Amino acid sequence: LFIPMKPDSPYIHLHERKRTWTPVQVSAGQLLTGGEEVVQRALALRCLEIPVGDFIADAMKGDLPDIKGCKELLASNVIDEEKHDIALNFAAEAHGVSPQFEAEAERIKKAWLELDRHPVLKAVVLERSVFFVLLPIFRFLGDTGLRTTSADISRDEQTHVAANTLVCEELGLKSDKELNKLRRATVAWVLQSLKGEDTSKHLSSNFWMASSDSLYTRGKAEGLLSTRASRMPAFFETNNVNLPQYA
């Protein structure tokens, strides 16, 4: 009887679960009516992908848990962020993002860069309670191309959040009021065009903010449970250019 060997550390276990994928150019399809501006703002925040990678690269120069596989996994996660940036740039090119939103997103990025906190802590707050709201926004308000991009990035981000949470626990890093305030302000900016409540929960700003709050405090959001299964678009209903490509 063959019994598979258990990985030497949780970092190695996470690394082994990764799946390789290739960013593809997408075409613009139909967005959910009423959600167009939210998608534009969420796409503008793609400018945070590279800084998150930089936060992790920065952390690798200092103290990290002396656990097998930790540095290798974090280095691999930095490369993922570059890939996410390429994939989201393809989506932004397809849909077009207003220069006003791009400029405002850059100011939000500046606020995250200037906040003096441990880089892994900033990364985990962004990934867990901002990116994991933006990705379901692409899925529920977006088109086929955005849903595919969201699914590919989500798989990576699950690994990133798990790894960065482990690092924060090992180093005794905890979030605080300032970080939480910036997290809420970032999500609120994305949701500006939505009413608090709407007949469609996905067009309700309260739904998305409650999801971010829950992800921040508890690491999960019941309202987003339906996004856990990687729902892939059916091949017969999809333009080939919008289908996932696995290396």
Where are these regions (language model features)?
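Non-heme di-metal
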Residues: 2-247
